[in-house]
Amino acid sequence: MARLKGLDTTLELTRYALALRAQHGFDFALRYYSHNAAKNLSLGEARALSSAGMQIGVVWETAGTYPGFFTLAQGVADGSAAYRMAREVIGQPPGSAIYFAVDYDASQADLDGPVSNYFTGVHAGLFAAGGGQPRYQVGVYGSGLACRTLRERGVAAFSWLSQSTGFAGSQEYARALNYDLIQYLPQRIEVEGEVLLVDPDATHPDRPAGLFQV
């Protein structure tokens, strides 16, 4: 497998899809599922990206920036909501991944306790919403420590290492190439006469990352 070049952004990319592929050589775009429609991946956008030859990845992210957010019940709710967006809005293919964000420098105690409970809830929510069918795989976005811990505990199949190199375990995780996706510091790119601020990303050269097309 080749190492793929991608980006993530809160911006809708429908009008930029062809140029992102043809002019900048992006292979994939990572977009959002959430309760905020303004930043969410839309069906039209997913179709435009796919038609341009790009793959898509998605992350569920709302308020996962502090320990108190992460509970079993919150995981169930988020897993269920993410399933509905993936299945009913986008038509995301089975077997692909939905990443869930741990967007802070979580301690080992946080990861062993509330964050792991949250991811257990995510699985339960996805399972229940899917009528007892494990339709989507679960990924984690976060620090190296978060990625390593949640994969070792079996509650995340994929890991997306955040750009925050000062977070616990992140530099070691990057050096060991343990990630499926890695995020880099923001950069500005010119597309269709506009300057967009995006986060560059890349896949691991030898592993899939749960990306998809529609």
Language-model region placement:
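Functionally critical loop-and-helix segments that line ligand-binding/catalytic clefts
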Residues: 2-10, 18, 23, 147-214
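Active-site cleft segment of glycoside hydrolase catalytic domains centered on the general acid/base Glu
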Residues: 106-130
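Short amphipathic alpha-helical segments and helix-helix/interface helices
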Residues: 16-21, 43-47, 119-123
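Anion (oxyanion) recognition and catalysis
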Residues: 22, 50-53, 127
